[in-house]
Amino acid sequence: MRIDEGFLTPEAIARLQQEEALSDKRHKRTAQQIEAIYSSGQNILVSASAGSGKTFVMVERILDKILRGISVDRLFISTFTVKAATELIERIEKKLHTAIAETQDYQLKAYLNDQLQALSQADIGTMDAFAQKLVHQHGYVLGISPHFRIIQDKAEQDILKREVFRQVFEDYMSQTDNKAFIQLVQNFSGRRKDSSAFREIVDSIYAFSQSTANPSSWLAEVFLRGAKTYTSFADIPDQVVDALLACMQDTADQLRDLTDMEGYAQTTKAGKLTAKYTKHLKMIDNLYEWASHFDSLYGKERLGQLAQELTALLPSGADITVAGHKYPIFKSLQEQLVGFRHLETILAYQQESLPLLEVLQAFVISFSEAYLAAKMQENAFEFSDIAHFAIEILQQAPDIRQAYQGHYHEVMVDEYQDNNHMQERLLELLSNGHNRFMVGDIKQSIYRFRQADPQIFNQKFKDYQSNPEHGKLILLKENFRSQSEVLNVTNAVFSRLMDESLGEITYDDKHQLVAGSEAQKQLHPENRAQLLLYNTDQAQEGTEEASTNDGISAGEVTLVAKEIIRLYNEEKVAFEDITLLVSSRTRNDTIFQVFNQYGIPLVADGGQENYLKSVEVMVMLDTLRSINNPLNDYALVALMRSPMFSFDEDQLARISLQSSSQDQPQAFYDKLSNSLRGQGEHPGLIGQELMTKLVDFDRTLRDWRQFAKLHSLYELIWKIFNDRFYFDFVASQPKAEQAQANLYALAIRADQFEQSGYKGLSRFIGMIDKVLETQNDLADVEVERPKHAVNLMTIHKSKGLEFHYVFILNFDKRFAMADLQAPIILNRDEGIGIKYVANVKELLRDEKLASLKVTMETLPYQLNKQQLRLATLSEQMRLLYVAMTRAEKKVYLVGKASKEKIQAKTADNSSEGRLALASRERLLSFQDWLLAITATFSKEDLFIDVRFVDDSDLTAEAVGQLRSSGLLQADDLKDNRQTEDIARALDMLDKVSKLNASYQAAIELPTVRTPSQLKTLYEPLMDTDGVDIIDQPYHRPKSFELPDFSKKKAVEPSQVGSSLHELMQRIPMSDQITAGDIEQALQLVSADAEVKARLDIKKVTAFFATTELGKLLQEHHQRLYREAPFAILKKDSLSQEQYVVRGIIDGYLLFEDRIVLFDYKTDRYQQSAELKQRYQQQMDLYAEALSQSYGIARVEKYLVLMGGSQLEVVRLDE
């Protein structure tokens, strides 16, 4: 392929697909993968199912673009995480190295080497990273300094938010006409007497608005849309009415099926219909009649009447009991009727809430503006601010927008299903309208809590499917990860569960997983999926297993441990090939306890934010609080009770009785002082042993308090560690490595706190307490994870990963639906819906009542609530899909249930091969969904076995123990012929030693060397030429230097050298380099201010302005290559073995007939000849590498010396 070769036509792609299909390759690309790699000329959406090779497609597409002459820095490539970007860059780099090694075309080699250099500057990363870069370069359009910082600490954000909220709140309260505002605050305060509840409402609205493309526009134009639109029965959307009618029919269907069950008494012994059956038949008839003829009987205007009649028709309870089992037949319908039943009254009072919402709208806008102003003053912003700045710049500056659109050949985005509207707007502005390449899978959109909107993907999917002229839709269905047992059960579950109404996409042939290779299609019956249910029937009442909470039980974990032991012992499955997936990071202690009991190594994925709540850190924080203020009773007692001093409850009680007066309450420290002086009320309670401990404690605390006045926090913390051996003590406790890492991090964080300009123990404690007040924490310190252990991680964390065996735990846990009861519910299209507290006193006509407050769900709230409910259930469905598709070989679903109840479960209604919508909406756990599917479609093979596990199956004998196959049993030693074996071993070792000696030089020869390592090899040769080489080891003359008490950090020469090289690399090359260009490049250098101050900018300016080499670089900057990596094969003279020399060349100019090589040096020197001699061999090596690469014999070599008193450019080949 030539680098100027055009892109493939559809006909050429078709031929390539046919050739690939007929080829004898072991791993063939699918036709859809080929289409995704080579299609061009229009927007492309790739719907890539789990394990379909989307990363492979992206890498191959990028490489194809590069090979066709599109430089990698002309591609915009967005990834969801920094880690994904790093992995993508590594794959591209590997592909480029392979291409360089395989080609013999020198021109192509040079071009691909250029691409390797350009890769580090290419826009491959997260949207946040790109937005920062754009605002850094063009923030001047909005008046933003390029030296802004990102507020990444949530605690810092919350502290600033609280301060801004307080100021805005006081402004609104101080207004003369504040009646509506006070009523607004009271509406959300409930029983609280402060403004905290209202502040939470404002926070949630602000956060939601930030995910939109234009927050201020959304707040001004959309925020009140629903409140102004839905004010009467006629405004109720058709889909809401349709959902109610469908629920009525579904309830009638379920009731009809229930009356046909064995055990339901339809007739009496006399043969007459039972009263219950007659009543149920009437219900069935009425439900069918009213639903079928809704328009003629009621219509929207009489919806309230229908709700009243349904309430009268249905029983008060939701269940019907048949043969001792309860069936919640009426639950779904009754839940829907709650809002409709009183809708007429709600609509009458709802209009009162609109003035309050207008005040709320104004307040949130004021808060948003004030919060942004506060951040502008600090020149510190959140990620969302930077993204909005980037959008604003591109919208306000057409020249900048057009420059980006003209620069990018293609705008590529990975994990497109997890984009929010802010990110989508930024991508639209960067694209020219027909050069977008989007890869994702709506079935794996699980980040709604980050305001991701899967409908962005879904709308494009539908548009491109219906209108190919708008863009190309490519489906990647083949899965190359999982065996057929995993694929089959996944398809069986989701084809009966997921559709457009719930799941937001229909799981049909377009989305079902297909095995991508013949090996995957081979059947392994032992890997058939299993639903393992711990039977709660046998659990004793009051025990954990009998509880109805959502926590995982010890029984569930024990059955998992039993299966893992079986896999390890019998199938030789390594622990690291097994992963446990849970829904959240917390409340997993039972898993660790049970696994520890059976000796199964387990490692949890990091990321928990409970650092400040770890025991060892809490002890240290209470110690610091006590040093700061001994009158803090809680902290002081906690310190005394801690392992550092080990006062027990009895001793603390004796001290607490030592008040000097019963009239005035005293702090515990005062009682401690009274105890020491013998002046308490009961001095006889303080024995000699306790007195000794008190004296030791008091002396130590006083010593620490005095030390804290004169020393840093870092030194104080380490003094506490050393004085009481606390750092050593935690090393003997469980999770010792983590505990010590946490304590060490506390000292480091305290030091960073003081380094940032804040001083003093009091301020540090205040900062920590503010973090805890805002319900925030700091991330746990990461420690090295054991390699051979079972993994425990959340489903969210597992996305994109794959494991041989997957256990999805707590399968019966109910979905978190708390958001459906929140005071407000926000919708991107309809705005806000609220619970309004209305005074309904006049409805009762009781003059004795001052007021009667009733909280009612307004119609916009109810509509937003229904949409949120569907969105939440849809995301849970996708979460299950992600979890199941992580497995390569086998998936286990683990929960708990009553065997008796499950076996008596009847089939749910189904429609078009799926569970009925009402059933799917009613069921609120993964387990409920799956059991409904198995009951409803029991006659079909669902590729999963349901198995109950009793306590009798989980005894210590039944579970078993891990067997180690590596231990040598004593019985195996009796026939051991030691003398003969040892002699044979010694003989073998002797032969190996002789062989090693004969090839000693080759063994010691490194495979890869750097030029600086080679320089030491040349030193003996340089010595023979009259150059003195200092004998090793070199001993410096002893001298006494005064200690440096300054706070300035020492700047190492190596730091200056590295920063200079980075500066010379960052200077934008042009025909005329100005001082401004150099100053701008200096700002981009990633070094401390102290290091930058040591850079001699005058010499850099003089280099380009006065030297011939500097002028040559500017004149021919198109031929300039900087920071160029190279590799050359050399032969060792002693061993005659080959080795690779690798390095980085500062720069060179490439002409047709010559190469101009140069290198910057910051070494101190007296005579330039010293450095010429020192670096001659290194430069010769660079020249040899360039000459071999380009086939050009003439290479001019220059050293640019910046370490002397004057700038000097010397040529080495003269």
Swiss-Prot record:
Keyword DNA repair: yes
GO CC annotation, single: DNA helicase complex
Name of the featured protein: ATP-dependent helicase/nuclease subunit A
Binding annotation for ATP: 48-55
Any GO molecular function: ATP binding
Role noted for this protein: The heterodimer acts as both an ATP-dependent DNA helicase and an ATP-dependent, dual-direction single-stranded exonuclease. Recognizes the chi site generating a DNA molecule suitable for the initiation of homologous recombination. The AddA nuclease domain is required for chi fragment generation; this subunit has the helicase and 3' -> 5' nuclease activities.
Domain called UvrD-like helicase C-terminal: residue spans: 512-800
Residue ranges of domain UvrD-like helicase ATP-binding in the record: 27-483
UniProt-listed Enzyme Commission number(s): 3.1.-.-, 5.6.2.4
Family named by the database record: Belongs to the helicase family. AddA subfamily.
Alphabetical keyword list: ATP-binding, DNA damage, DNA repair, DNA-binding, Exonuclease, Helicase, Hydrolase, Isomerase, Nuclease, Nucleotide-binding
Essential cofactor(s): Mg(2+)
Entries under Pfam families matching the protein: PDDEXK_1 (PF12705), UvrD-helicase (PF00580), UvrD_C (PF13361)
Gene: addA
Keyword S-adenosyl-L-methionine among UniProt keywords: no
GO terms for biological process, alphabetical: double-strand break repair via homologous recombination
InterPro entries xref list: AddA, DNA_helicase_UvrD-like_C, DNA_helicase_UvrD/REP, P-loop_NTPase, PDDEXK-like_dom_sf, PDDEXK_AddAB-type, Restrct_endonuc-II-like, UvrD-like_ATP-bd
Reactions catalysed according to its record: Couples ATP hydrolysis with the unwinding of duplex DNA by translocating in the 3'-5' direction; ATP + H2O = ADP + phosphate + H(+)
Subunit structure: Heterodimer of AddA and AddB/RexB.
